[in-house]
From Swiss-Prot:
It comes from the Bacteria. This is Small ribosomal subunit protein bS20. Binds directly to 16S ribosomal RNA. Keywords: Ribonucleoprotein, Ribosomal protein, RNA-binding, rRNA-binding. SUPFAM superfamilies: Ribosomal protein S20. Belongs to the bacterial ribosomal protein bS20 family. GO terms for molecular function: small ribosomal subunit rRNA binding; structural constituent of ribosome. GO terms for cellular component: small ribosomal subunit. It comes from Rhodospirillum rubrum (strain ATCC 11170 / ATH 1.1.1 / DSM 467 / LMG 4362 / NCIMB 8255 / S1). GO terms for biological process: translation. HAMAP family: Ribosomal_bS20. Pfam families: Ribosomal_S20p. InterPro entries: Ribosomal_bS20 (IPR002583), Ribosomal_bS20_sf (IPR036510).
Length: 88
């Protein structure tokens, strides 16, 4: 158990930030799953629409520090490639 006031504060702060970060990661996953579901159904227009909504969420994850930039870029790139492959 922490004895210093600042250490106690950090424990509380870390717990609250962890909760927020987990919620943010879950939100990103939800949007990505919606895109993947649209891709699986073969509906290119729905996939594009879902992708346009998911892309800013993924980038926001980078800004907020829950995703690495390369991870976000990789996710976006792979989803985009899968959407393009629907019509081909």
């Amino acid at each position: 158990m922490a004895n210093h006031k600042s250490a106690k504060k950090r424990i509380l702060r870390n717990a609250s930030r962890s909760e927020i970060n987990h919620a943010r990661i879950g939100r990103i996953r939800t949007f990505v799953k919606k895109v993947e579901a649209a891709i699986a159904s073969g509906d290119k227009d729905a996939a594009k629409a879902a992708f346009q909504i998911a892309m800013p969420e993924v980038q926001r994850g980078v800004t907020k520090g829950v995703l690495h930039q390369n991870t976000a870029s990789r996710k976006i790139s792979r989803l985009s490639a899968r959407i393009k492959a629907i019509g081909a």
